[in-house]
Design a protein with these regions (language model features):
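Class I SAM-dependent transferase core
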Residues: 1-85, 93-97, 101, 114-117
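Conserved nucleotide-cofactor-binding alpha/beta core module
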Residues: 77-169
Length: 170
């Protein structure tokens, strides 16, 4: 799992673009600069890892574009030790960014292949998250309440069960 000077340089350029687009939270920028996005992508797309676009990761899912990850993460206003529920692990990139910011991350993925791949990768990267293979629609009431909840997959509505698992003010 190489993270070369080229990758680091490309991340610096990506950070400049995110700042130009209005991302101001230094913790978000630091986390995105620290997490090697290319490790979360299919080998066919490696040379595009730091382009601000979404790319396929299998099971008809995508790794979100960096701006989307930065924008949503900035909206969360993460504080160290926040207990965060992520619905839709996907590649694991968003969970890794949240973990890098000091969040205690619980992440759910319904696609078995993506769940196994992201769990293996994040474990290798020493990203200590709670991984659950399930449909995120019901959330994780056994671990509630959560300071923050982020839905990173397509959802026609916010399930009421998730709202009930959010701390007041979360």
């Amino acid at each position: 799992m190489e993270d070369s000077f080229i990758h680091k340089g490309l991340r610096k350029k990506l950070i400049e673009k995110l700042v130009d687009r209005g991302i101001r939270d230094e913790k978000v920028l630091f986390a995105i600069d620290s997490v090697p996005r290319h490790l979360f992508m299919d080998k066919a797309f490696l040379k595009f890892a730091y382009v601000d676009k979404a790319f396929p990761i299998g099971d008809n899912q995508t790794i979100s574009q960096p701006y989307t990850v930065a924008f949503q993460t900035q909206l969360l206003e993460i504080k160290k030790f926040d207990k965060v529920l992520e619905i839709g692990t996907g590649s694991g990139y968003q969970a890794s960014v949240l973990h890098k910011m000091g969040a205690d991350v619980y992440t759910i993925e319904r696609h078995k292949k993506l769940y196994l791949r992201s769990k293996e990768l994040l474990t290798k990267l020493n990203c200590k998250c709670m991984f659950i293979h399930a449909d995120g629609y019901k959330g994780l009431p056994q671990f509630a309440p959560f300071d923050k909840i982020i839905i990173t997959c397509g959802a026609p509505e916010i399930p009421n069960d998730l709202l009930l698992q959010l701390k007041i003010g979360g």
